[in-house]
Design a protein with these regions (language model features):
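Short alpha-helical segments used as structural interaction elements across diverse proteins
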Residues: 173-174, 188
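Conserved AdoMet/S-adenosylmethionine-binding subsite of the radical SAM
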Residues: 1-169, 173
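Radical SAM enzyme core and accessory elements
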Residues: 168, 180-199
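Conserved histidine-centered catalytic loops in small-molecule metabolism enzymes
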Residues: 177
Length: 199
């Protein structure tokens, strides 16, 4: 058996739309008689289902919440995260702040960097204003391109410039290391291929 000490619910559907089952799983994972995983080592990733973020906060379980933000405003986010049309970005951030106040657990904001879309100096400044003084961690993720979607990561100097603006505003910020992109197996690149059968 390979021991493990953390769990991340991400990339297999929206966890907060399966709320009851996810919560049940979290409690089972924490059970000393089962996996005995600390709540603090469990992360739920969400695209920002506002009512469920408040609901999760009121459970007062000290798990880590990661929110796929990806934009500093509704105009850009509505393109990148279609479900955001149901929840304004300011409401998502307000829910995140409530989560922090209730659980004392700092929220992580995931932010994919896409060239000529959300990675400008103005975007970085707008992101700082959006988040305000809320304690959080910002995870910058240069997009991994695919052969079918013509979206590209910014140049490294643009990524660094974006990060530096956030750091100067006191935002703890890291850039995710890219792994597997050379074989189309990085985050966002895994896909199913259909082969035409020859008859």
């Amino acid at each position: 058996d390979i021991p493990f000490h953390s769990i991340v619910l991400m990339g297999a559907g929206e966890p907060l739309t399966n709320y009851e089952e996810v919560l049940h799983f979290i409690h089972l994972a924490n059970d000393p008689e089962l996996l005995n995983i600390s709540y603090r080592n469990i992360t739920i990733s969400t695209c920002g289902i506002v009512p469920q973020i408040y609901r999760l906060a009121d459970e007062n379980i000290p798990i880590t919440l990661a929110i796929s933000l990806h934009a500093p405003n509704d105009r850009i986010r509505n393109v990148l995260v279609p479900i955001s049309k149901n929840f304004r970005i300011k409401d998502v951030v307000s829910a995140a702040e409530y989560y922090f106040k209730k659980t004392k657990r700092r929220v992580t904001f995931e932010y994919i960097l896409i060239k000529d879309m959300n990675a400008s100096v103005e975007n970085a400044k707008e992101l700082c204003c959006l988040i305000g003084k809320m304690p959080c961690h910002i995870n910058l993720i240069p997009i991994n391109g695919t052969e079918h979607i013509k979206l590209y990561p910014p140049e490294w100097k643009e990524i660094k410039r974006f990060q530096d603006i956030l750091l100067k505003k006191g935002k703890e910020t890291t850039v995710r290391k890219q792994m597997g992109d050379e074989i189309q197996a990085a985050c966002g690149q895994l896909k199913r291929r259909y082969l035409n059968s020859v008859t």
